[in-house]
Amino acid sequence: MQIVILKNSAEVAEYGANIFKKQLQSKPDSVLGLATGSTPVSLYQGLIEANKLGDISFKEVTSFNLDEYLGLAGTHPQSYRYFMNEQLFDHIDIDKANTHVPPGDAENPIQACDGYEEQIQAAGGIDIQLLGIGRNGHIGFNEPSSGLMSRTRVKTLTKATIEDNARFFKEDEYQPHLSITMGIGTILDAKKVVLLATGENKADAILATVEGALTASCPASALQLHKNAVLVIDEAAASKLSDRDFYKHIEAENQKLLARLAKS
């Protein structure tokens, strides 16, 4: 894994946005894997601005989101389809017919999961997958104990995840306890994975992901198996890593090498 440690959340978002800009500039018809939650919002704002400036276009892009609450239609304000429309799709030149979010209101959720996998394969697979990470190391809604080669399926949310997400729901509002999520195996199939994490509350999860054992107890640890995974984290999220200066040194040397290769 490539570990990039930056000062704060603003730098994390900017770095992540630049990765996606370069992807779209080199391959305008990219298949993007997208995520929801508070962490990607600033990254999306950077992409919206770049699109308005004409630096990138989404006209040829196909996208697949990681997950969706089971039981919420896409028009529900707390659904992830609604979130993506508000935070990204409504503000860029993407064809919404090419944007895919697992159907939370599917009559047959199991069949819908199989269909989602088929859609990803039909699109040629995901070129670059954006991830956040939960306090317990979950990616997407792959909670601890998830199979490391799992595919898109229905998952029960842990109490910790339900509590973390409760802030998005009104006190008397129905909050789903089930979801449809890409599996860890589905995520690992992406050609590149970019995980963003900020804040001290993610430090334990980042420690387990980077330096811990490969285990279903920390789903994000599966990224140790990926040949092109980038973790972009701030100082707070990196605070429990054993040798932050070493990771920074590695990244600095990597950037020097890339700069030298770019000139040759």
Swiss-Prot record:
E.C. number: 3.5.99.6
The family database entries (CDD domains) matched by this protein are listed as: GlcN6P_deaminase
> Which Gene Ontology BP annotations are present?
carbohydrate metabolic process; glucosamine catabolic process; N-acetylglucosamine catabolic process; N-acetylneuraminate catabolic process
**GO CC term, one of those recorded:** cytoplasm
Q: Which reaction does it catalyse?
A: alpha-D-glucosamine 6-phosphate + H2O = beta-D-fructose 6-phosphate + NH4(+)
Pathway field of the UniProt record reads: Amino-sugar metabolism; N-acetylneuraminate degradation; D-fructose 6-phosphate from N-acetylneuraminate: step 5/5
Q: Which UniProt keywords apply?
A: Carbohydrate metabolism, Hydrolase
Is Amino-acid biosynthesis included in the keywords of this UniProt record? no
> What residues make up the catalytic site?
D67 (proton acceptor), N136 (for ring-opening step), H138 (proton acceptor), E143 (for ring-opening step)
GO MF term list? glucosamine-6-phosphate deaminase activity; identical protein binding
Taxonomically, the superkingdom here is Bacteria
Q: Which InterPro entries does this entry report, sorted A to Z?
A: Glc/Gal-6P_isomerase (IPR006148), Glucosamine6P_isomerase (IPR004547), Glucosamine6P_isomerase_CS (IPR018321), NagB/RpiA_transferase-like (IPR037171)
Any Pfam family hit: Glucosamine_iso
| Known role | Catalyzes the reversible isomerization-deamination of glucosamine 6-phosphate (GlcN6P) to form fructose 6-phosphate (Fru6P) and ammonium ion.
NCBIfam families according to UniProt: nagB (TIGR00502), PRK00443.1-4 (NF001684)
Listed under subunit, the entry gives: Homohexamer.
Q: Which family does it belong to?
A: Belongs to the glucosamine/galactosamine-6-phosphate isomerase family. NagB subfamily.
Q: What is this protein called?
A: Glucosamine-6-phosphate deaminase
Source organism: Shewanella woodyi (strain ATCC 51908 / MS32)
